[in-house]
């Protein structure tokens, strides 16, 4: 017999069991696609400006080197500010910026203090401009650095005491697009596409790997690393890409070899799931048995009391109103009286 007061609890436990089954199957099912991607910017790039503070501008030219050249890496799509030697503007005669870009004619931007004139020659890129008016600030800015801005920039300052130069070998850095996918026969392919400079790819654990580089006309490089693992106990591999703009790590699960023995770890979720299901089912069964047993026992004990209470009025009524009971009583009374009379006569 079903126990109505247990229905809600049993339904709730069954729903919980189904939910646990679905979760365990989802967790145990192997996934051949990319599992995780992490990115960490751990390379200290040069700031967008190498300019000195105004307080550091000196009038003592002996402390300023006549010519300085600096290699400066700048990340693409950022802004960059290039500075002239730290010399006060009131001591200047002419300021000239020479810009030499790859595949383009040399560009010259000049300012003459005496006439307050500016002049440009072969300068077509509108993103390369003075920071402000050249009579107030001699710095040069590049808005939204692109690959085409890779080149050499030099500031020439002419003073009564001589000429001072500061040059920049500007190296534009391009972050590669990293992908990882699995080929057949436990082979994984990791690619760092269109990076500048070329990225470096390494694997964990190490396998039988081959790396190729493809160079593009814009100066970027695509690096492709193909790696194979013969060892069957290697289930997860990690591709680590190192680059000046930051490092990235991707990992993927390899497909098991057909017929190969599965690792014991793969069965742990199913074992745990089986134990949980058996525990819940056993608990439900005990609740059902104990509840129904108590229900039947209470019903059995209450039934005789009700029948006895119901029969007593009926029996009394029958005994009082049935003529058969009256006749019997009269006969018994007559026999008793006759017995008393006989006893008295015998005594006399």
Swiss-Prot record:
Q: Specify the glycosylation sites in chain numbering.
A: 31, 60, 69, 116, 122, 185, 218, 233, 247
Segments on the Extracellular side according to the record's topology features: 29-265
Q: Which family does it belong to?
A: Belongs to the CD200R family.
Signal sequence coordinates? 1-24
> Topological domains (Cytoplasmic): residue ranges?
287-348
Which organism's genome codes for this protein?
Homo sapiens (Human)
One GO cellular component assignment for this chain's record is: cell surface
Complex and partners: CD200 and CD200R1 interact via their respective N-terminal Ig-like domains. Interacts with Human herpesvirus 8 vOX2 protein.
A molecular function (GO) held by this record is:
signaling receptor activity
State its role: Inhibitory receptor for the CD200/OX2 cell surface glycoprotein. Limits inflammation by inhibiting the expression of pro-inflammatory molecules including TNF-alpha, interferons, and inducible nitric oxide synthase (iNOS) in response to selected stimuli. Also binds to HHV-8 K14 viral CD200 homolog with identical affinity and kinetics as the host CD200.
List UniProt keywords, sorted A-Z. Answer: Cell membrane, Disulfide bond, Glycoprotein, Host-virus interaction, Membrane, Receptor, Secreted, Signal, Transmembrane, Transmembrane helix
Q: In which tissues is it expressed?
A: Expressed in granulocytes, monocytes, most T-cells, neutrophils, basophils and a subset of NK, NKT and B-cells (at protein level). Expressed in bone marrow, lymph nodes, spleen, lung, liver, spinal cord, kidney. Expressed in monocyte-derived dendritic and mast cells.
- One Pfam family, please name it: C2-set_2
Q: Does the keyword Mitochondrion apply?
A: no
Question: Which residue intervals define the domain Ig-like C2-type in the entry?
Answer: 160-251
Q: Which PROSITE patterns does this chain map to?
A: IG_LIKE
Protein name, per record = Cell surface glycoprotein CD200 receptor 1
Question: GO terms for biological process?
Answer: heterotypic cell-cell adhesion; intracellular signal transduction; negative regulation of interleukin-6 production; negative regulation of macrophage migration; negative regulation of neuroinflammatory response; negative regulation of T cell migration; regulation of neuroinflammatory response; signal transduction
Cystine crosslinks? 83-155, 107-123, 190-239, 209-227
Q: What sections of the protein cross the membrane?
A: 266-286
